[in-house]
A protein has these predicted regions:
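Alpha-helical transmembrane segments and their immediate juxtamembrane cytosolic regions
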Residues: 1-388
Length: 388
């Protein structure tokens, strides 16, 4: 989310390729999860635990923002950092609106060209096609969102709040974290959320998901130094592995009917519903458990991070926003193709692999494009000489 290319404002920092790796893996998972009935999507995290790629994206976005903009706040450049963050929020908003328009066009063309209204109903654009004059205004206010376009509005709201969050984490970190946790609890108790149109609320409740984002920003500012001992303790590792195993067993009951009967009724009442919209605590704990294991066994100096094997995923992670937008189009294109040909398992695998490889190719092109020298950049004015 933060722009690592900002110079002059931000202190130079070595890039943690683990973040790019996890963003790249997350982009592949989102692409596969957005293809209905795709057998390859069984490889994604949501089928084996409470959390999924959404938790990773929100945490990493917060961590990166804290890591990148924290030094600016510390150097009393709050206004400059706030200006940069507001500009970033505007960029995300423009990206969302363009993605919305092209996505609507893609789905509506498929629905009309192949006389299949199922696409309009599946992706929640049927009302837009009937009343475009009303719905475009609601879309501009982020109240109307087709299926699969919920995450960027969440980021926009979080980035808008980021200057205040970073200031609080720098001045009063304990109180800011406590306030975030209290806000999360109150939002869940009183059902606080932003309204959607024509009915309902936001799929990703920003009042709940801010907790993970704020925690990520705090970890980024402090480089997680204050919890390093806790993360590396044997007791925390055992608890993390136990929670991951428990989550796996519960999720398996969703897929294997006879396992469901083995879960006590009292436990069912405690566990469910495991709500994604309001960031259920079980999902949050599962993500934190995975993060503990990942940080423990994948250090930032891991040689594989510089290998050719992981390079494609890291490239995707380094171009997260454009690749996410591309993935939205590719997931619908894959769904459309499989519906039209009534694709079998082989077709599902081929389409999924082709989409993932295309994401890698586009990420490679974007990286090459960014590496090109800017021959039209204005030369910097020489610094004024000091009087002796």
């Amino acid at each position: 989310m933060a722009d690592r290319n900002d110079t002059g404002l931000l202190a130079p920092a070595e890039r943690d390729l683990r973040l790019d790796l996890m963003r790249g893996i997350g982009q592949w998972m989102v692409f596969l999860d957005h293809i209905p009935y795709d057998i390859v999507s069984w490889l994604t995290l949501r089928n084996y635990g409470f959390s999924d790629a959404a938790e990773f994206f929100v945490f990493i976005s917060g961590y990166t923002a804290g890591f990148v903009y924290g030094p600016a706040i510390a150097n009393r450049q709050f206004l400059a950092a706030a200006k940069r963050l507001l500009k970033r929020a505007w960029q995300l908003y423009i990206a969302h609106i363009f993605l919305f328009l092209f996505f609507i066009a893609q789905i509506s063309r498929a629905a009309r060209r192949f006389d299949n209204p199922m696409y309009g109903n599946e992706y929640n654009i049927f009302l837009f096609l009937e009343h475009p004059d009303v719905m475009i205004g609601q879309a501009l206010m982020l109240k109307f969102k087709p299926v699969d376009l919920d995450v960027l509005p969440l980021y926009i709201v979080l980035v808008l709040a980021l200057p205040a969050i970073l200031w609080g984490l720098f001045k009063r970190p304990a109180w800011t974290l406590l306030g975030s946790a209290i806000f999360y609890v109150l939002a869940r108790i009183f059902d606080w959320n932003l309204p959607s149109f024509p009915s309902g609320n936001w799929y990703f409740n920003p009042f709940a998901w801010q907790l993970l984002f704020v925690f990520g920003a705090w970890c980024g500012i402090t480089k997680a130094a204050k919890i390093t001992t806790l993360i590396r303790s044997r007791a925390v590792m055992i608890l993390a592995l136990a929670w991951i195993a428990f989550s796996f067993l519960i999720v398996m009951t969703w897929h294997v009917p006879f396992l469901d009967a083995l879960v006590p009724k009292w436990m069912i009442h405690i566990i469910y519903p495991i709500d994604k919209s309001d960031l259920d605590m079980f999902r949050l704990l599962h993500f934190l458990a995975l993060a503990v294991v990942f940080v423990r066994y994948v250090p930032s100096s891991w040689p594989m991070l510089h290998s050719r094997v992981l390079r494609p995923l890291i490239l995707i992670g380094q171009n997260s926003l454009p690749i996410f937008c591309l993935g939205v189009f590719l997931s619908f294109a894959a769904h459309w193709f499989l519906v039209q040909i009534e694709g079998d398992v082989v077709a599902q695998i081929l389409v999924s692999v082709a989409g993932m490889m295309l994401m890698v190719a586009v990420a490679w092109v974007l990286n090459r494009f960014k590496a090109l020298p800017d021959h039209f950049a204005l030369p910097k004015a020489p610094a004024p000489e000091r009087a002796v």
